Amino acid sequence: MKLFIFGSTGDLVNRKVLPALQNFNSEKLEIYAIGRKNITQEKYLHHVCSEDRCTPIFQESIKYIKLNFDKEDICGKKCIANFDQNKTNYVYISLPPSQIKKILYSLKKFKELNYSIKILIEKPFGSNLLEAKELKQLIEENNLGKDIFLSDHYLFKQNIINLPKQDFTKLEIKSTEEVGLEGRTTYYNSVGALKDMVQSHFLNITQKISKEELKDKIEILEFKRGQYKNYSKELGKNQ
C-alpha cells in the first residue's frame, strides 16, 4: 500500500498522522512524505521520529520527497516515478487551501493515465466560500468526485465521536491546547485561528451533535477573538 502525504513537514502530520500510521502496524505500508523543505531523508526522520517515537521498521517505510509547490504541475516526474499503476495509490493532503488546486490538477493527469488514486483532503476546503466552490467545480469537471474524501480530524477524536445528538438553545465550545504556533507562522499568518478552529472544527462539531438542521436557525449573540498567548514572541523566532 502506497500513501503519499502532501504537507508532510506540517504540525498535524508530525503530531497526529504519522503516530497513527505507526499504530496501523502494517509492514506493507510505503509512505512518501512530500514537502517543500530542502532537507535530507535523515533530517526528516530526525524531525518526525525524535525521542524514539518511531520503530526501525516504521522509519524504513518512510521516504522524503522534496517538491517545488510553486510550480503549476507540482507532482510531475518525481511523483509518477513512485506511483503504482497496478494498485490504488492513496493521497493525503494537509496543506493551505491555495495549494490544493495545483495538487488536484496534477492528480487529475495521473487519472487520465489510468492510475487508481484515492484522495483524502484535510480541512480547510478553501479559504472562503468562493474558493470552496472553485475546488468543488474542479472536482466535478474532472470526474474526481468518487475518489475524493473530505476530512476534519477533530471529528475523529474519541470524545467527539461519543457525543450524542441533542437539542440545545445555547452551546459553548472551549478548545484548550497546550501548544502554540509550533513553527506554523506561515500557515497562521495566511489562515488565522478563526478560520483554522471556528469555521471548521467548531461548526462541524455543532452540526454533528445537533438533532435538527441548523440552517437559518443560528443566531450569534457574541464572539470573542484573541491570539495565542506567546504569538508575538513566536512570530519573531519563526519568521
Residue ranges of each PLM-predicted region?
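Secretory/organelle targeting and membrane-embedding segments
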Residues: M1-L120, F125-Q239
